[in-house]
UniProtKB/Swiss-Prot annotation:
Residue intervals of the ABC transporter domain: 5-233
Keyword hit for Glycoprotein: no
Recorded GO MF terms: ATP binding; ATP hydrolysis activity
InterPro entries reported in the protein's UniProt record: AAA+_ATPase, ABC_transporter-like_ATP-bd, ABC_transporter-like_CS, P-loop_NTPase
This protein's name: Uncharacterized ABC transporter ATP-binding protein YhcH
Transmembrane segments: none
Organism in which the protein naturally occurs: Bacillus subtilis (strain 168)
Gene behind the chain: yhcH
Pfam families reported for this sequence: ABC_tran (PF00005)
UniProtKB keywords: ATP-binding, Nucleotide-binding, Transport
Record flagged with keyword ATP-binding: yes
PROSITE patterns assigned to the protein according to its UniProt record, in alphabetical order: ABC_TRANSPORTER_1 (PS00211), ABC_TRANSPORTER_2 (PS50893)
């Protein structure tokens, strides 16, 4: 897939303190890319530099190959962004808000406004005043504003903040639709691990302004040695039969750390001992597990971030 945004050694120093430390990575079209990290990790600061709201101390951001520092006007036209909360005129209707925003962008027609309204699912309420909108509807109206000029990259800072579960799901579904149907790159930041796992294709894990790692959220590749769970009828007997393996006994089976190629041999051993097997599955690490491993934080610290 084509690279649409690239960070090259991006650094931010404030009063002698390094807030963002030498970030470099690329983002591709058609993917939802997440910034994950606790509050204070540097997610919003990075986004502000990506959209030109904050100067870089070092490095550069390339948007569709154009430099945010040297060709700002050309680069920023490819971006649609909501940093923190969408700014809306609450005493105007949703439609009037979009008309106001359209005046700042060349070539936005009535048909285009109608198109984005339908895309974000606000057709039935677009002529109501924004002050009557729920928080989720305001987020969707902000999303519509961002889409009026057909950006290649959509950047959203904490897009699900304050939303109820239904509102979170709505936003998530709309973002996936944009990547799937329009090939847009969507960049989101959040400290909510469970939501990022559902929303993103890849994530960059930030901690104290540094890039810890970039991971595929739904990585189907099983590690060379992974943990497998064997649900059996006689767990204690199974543990005895398999005592040469690194295993952990459970009430309804055993967990064994082994290579994928060894699984058939383990099954054969159990069958030979007439131990009934009901299920064999790999125990995959959740995004939370991987995040905690890489950052060294506890579950309690993440939950209160």
């Amino acid at each position: 897939m084509k690279t649409v945004l690239e960070l090259k050694n991006v650094t931010k120093n404030i009063r002698g303190r390094t807030i963002i430390d030498d970030l470099s990575f690329t983002i591709r079209e058609g993917e939802v890319f997440g910034f994950l990290g606790p509050n204070g990790a540097g997610k919003t600061t990075t986004i502000r530099m990506m959209v030109g709201l904050m100067k870089l101390s070092k490095g550069d951001v390339l948007i569709c190959g154009q430099s945010i520092t040297k060709e700002y006007a050309k680069a920023i036209k490819h971006i649609g962004a909501i940093v923190e909360n969408p700014e809306l005129y609450k005493f105007l209707s949703g439609y009037k808000n979009l008309q106001q925003f359209a005046r700042m962008v060349k070539g936005v027609t009535k048909e285009k406004i109608d198109e984005v309204v339908e895309l974000v699912g606000l057709t039935d309420r677009i002529h109501d005043k924004v002050k009557t909108y729920s928080l989720g509807m305001r987020q969707r109206l902000g999303l519509a504003q961002c889409l009026l000029h057909d950006p290649k990259v959509l950047i959203l800072d904490e897009p699900t903040n304050g939303l109820d579960p239904a509102g979170i799901r709505e936003i998530r579904d709309h973002l996936k639709k944009l990547t799937r149907e329009r090939g847009m790159a969507v960049i989101v930041s959040s400290h909510l691990l469970s939501e990022m796992e559902l929303m993103c294709d890849r994530i960059a894990i930030l901690q104290k302004g540094k890039l810890i790692d970039i991971q595929n959220v739904k990585d189907e590749n099983i590690d060379e040695n992974d943990t497998y769970f064997f649900q059996v009828e006689q767990p204690s007997e199974a543990a005895t039969v398999l005592n040469q393996y690194d295993l952990l006994s459970k009430t309804n089976g055993v967990e064994i750390k082994l290579a994928k190629e060894e699984v058939p041999a383990v099954i054969e051993l159990l069958v030979m001992q007439q131990i009934r097997i009901y299920e064999v599955k790999v125990i995959t690490k959740s995004l939370e597990d991987r995040f905690l491993e890489m950052t060294g934080e506890t579950k309690e610290e993440v939950q209160h971030a």
